[in-house]
Amino acid sequence: MPPDLRMQPLPFPMMTLTSETKLDLEKAGVLVLGVEPSADSGESSDGKTTANCIAVSSLPESLAATVKNACSSGEVTGKPGELTSFATGNAQTPWIVLAGLGASDKRTRGSAIELGAAVVRSLASKPRQQITFALGDGVATENHDAVVAGAVSGCEGQHLYQREPSISVPEAIAFVGYSAESVSRGEKLGQSINHTRRLVNEPPSIMNPTGFAQYAEKIASDCGLTCEVWDEKKLEAENCRAILAVGRASTSPPRLVMLRHDGGGDEAPLVVVGKGVTFDSGGLSLKPSDGMVDMKCDMAGAATVVGVMNALAKLKVPRNVIGLCGLAENMVSGDSYKLGDVIETRSGKTIEILNTDAEGRVVLADTLDVAVQQKPQAIVDLATLTGACMVALGIDVAGLMTNNQALCDAVQSAAESECEPVWQLPMFSLYDDKVKSKVADIKNVGEGRWGGAITAAKFLENFVADVPWVHIDIAGPAFVDSPKPHRDAGATGVMVRSLVRWIENAS
């Protein structure tokens, strides 16, 4: 057995969140006020740029004067994402953050979640007892939960094993004028995003298939999901030969995690499937070091499934939903699966292996067949599947591919509502021949360099039977190299919000 390399990461970020009917300056701590560009030209008589503080009327006269002076100083514009912090000299409210909201017709759920996260991150350099958001009517009521979700997600980063953490979690955050329901929903969404990010950001020595399954079991126990874990013996009994082939070179054997949320009575379930390659060396088709350094993130699809299922359970969504995570570590040993191997999958279809670094689709072949066995209304899978999708769409956009346009439209609409950019790629039948094999039913890579994201989806289409299905390639947006004001580098938790919205709206 390998040595136990598990360490204790920083605790999962938890803080007290409250809904307040009115501003109490005696316990406000750091006060966050929303500002927008002035309704006129945005310039004062002396040519300085001006802004308008939306909730200034709720402040006592002396503090209101301080805020108005700042807004007319020329340093505050109210542009979206702009944060201006200053000491007030006021004993009750010693520190204020003016948060730019932008023009009212440009404010979205995306800007709301980024606002909440950016504010908290800007204050995270030292411990804070209390942060109070008093944004007035600067954020639409239907987006209040997004501000809260952002504030929560802003407390999580990739600094899990720093001896001196770069993010200090505030003890409490209050939201003035937000309903208790909005605060509760936002907290649950933010925590679910953070669970996804935590899973991806953990080192691969810890978040291997066994470690991932244990994390999922803990989540299920905490939020009331049913959890079933298939170990290697169960995988053998279920004829999951594709998952076993990918993972057999690793000392950490494969797993399949099934999470079940029963909220919809007798209706057929929706199934969300995630690729969970907890580390991808490329196998015998070995990646170079530069291509391997971030490959702990190759299980972001499965991590997203866990985040989505946690949110559904916490929000008590009235739907039946099953989350499936196919977990394997793609390593190198004398027992590695090889180029030229033919694998009989759980469905009975055979795969010719021409590249062991196209392993995610092989893992998904069996996992999707398990999904089909659940007799679902629809299947959505997520995977960091292809670099080709990043070449096609860039690193910020997820690719959608489908066998059912109505389902794809519903998923795309949900993503657009949550401001998570997606784009549909074609699934023309002319691509079918690209994955046909001369020695097996199909092969695990297409012909040549072209259309790689689509040929990967065409491979997966072989394993969904006639079930309505959408494949989401999140290779670009799931993991990023550089931080932004609203999030750390590393895992992003992309598509958790979008899939929760899709499931809530599913008819």
Curated annotation (Swiss-Prot):
<dbReference type="InterPro" id="IPR000819">
    <property type="entry name" value="Peptidase_M17_C"/>
</dbReference>
<feature type="binding site">
    <location>
        <position position="298"/>
    </location>
    <ligand>
        <name>Mn(2+) 2</name>
    </ligand>
</feature>
<feature type="active site">
    <location>
        <position position="287"/>
    </location>
</feature>
<protein>
    <recommendedName>
        <fullName>Probable cytosol aminopeptidase</fullName>
        <ecNumber>3.4.11.1</ecNumber>
        <ecNumber>3.4.11.10</ecNumber>
    </recommendedName>
</protein>
<keyword id="KW-0031">Aminopeptidase</keyword>
<feature type="active site">
    <location>
        <position position="361"/>
    </location>
</feature>
<feature type="binding site">
    <location>
        <position position="357"/>
    </location>
    <ligand>
        <name>Mn(2+) 1</name>
    </ligand>
</feature>
<dbReference type="InterPro" id="IPR023042">
    <property type="entry name" value="Peptidase_M17_leu_NH2_pept"/>
</dbReference>
<comment type="function">
    <text>Presumably involved in the processing and regular turnover of intracellular proteins. Catalyzes the removal of unsubstituted N-terminal amino acids from various peptides.</text>
</comment>
<keyword id="KW-0378">Hydrolase</keyword>
<dbReference type="Pfam" id="PF02789">
    <property type="entry name" value="Peptidase_M17_N"/>
</dbReference>
<dbReference type="GO" id="GO:0070006">
    <property type="term" value="F:metalloaminopeptidase activity"/>
</dbReference>
<dbReference type="GO" id="GO:0008233">
    <property type="term" value="F:peptidase activity"/>
</dbReference>
<dbReference type="InterPro" id="IPR011356">
    <property type="entry name" value="Leucine_aapep/pepB"/>
</dbReference>
<keyword id="KW-0479">Metal-binding</keyword>
<keyword id="KW-0464">Manganese</keyword>
<dbReference type="GO" id="GO:0006508">
    <property type="term" value="P:proteolysis"/>
</dbReference>
<dbReference type="GO" id="GO:0030145">
    <property type="term" value="F:manganese ion binding"/>
</dbReference>
<keyword id="KW-0963">Cytoplasm</keyword>
<feature type="binding site">
    <location>
        <position position="275"/>
    </location>
    <ligand>
        <name>Mn(2+) 2</name>
    </ligand>
</feature>
<dbReference type="InterPro" id="IPR008283">
    <property type="entry name" value="Peptidase_M17_N"/>
</dbReference>
<dbReference type="Pfam" id="PF00883">
    <property type="entry name" value="Peptidase_M17"/>
</dbReference>
<feature type="binding site">
    <location>
        <position position="359"/>
    </location>
    <ligand>
        <name>Mn(2+) 1</name>
    </ligand>
</feature>
<feature type="binding site">
    <location>
        <position position="359"/>
    </location>
    <ligand>
        <name>Mn(2+) 2</name>
    </ligand>
</feature>
<feature type="binding site">
    <location>
        <position position="280"/>
    </location>
    <ligand>
        <name>Mn(2+) 1</name>
    </ligand>
</feature>
<keyword id="KW-0645">Protease</keyword>
<comment type="similarity">
    <text>Belongs to the peptidase M17 family.</text>
</comment>
<dbReference type="GO" id="GO:0005737">
    <property type="term" value="C:cytoplasm"/>
</dbReference>
<dbReference type="InterPro" id="IPR043472">
    <property type="entry name" value="Macro_dom-like"/>
</dbReference>
<feature type="binding site">
    <location>
        <position position="280"/>
    </location>
    <ligand>
        <name>Mn(2+) 2</name>
    </ligand>
</feature>
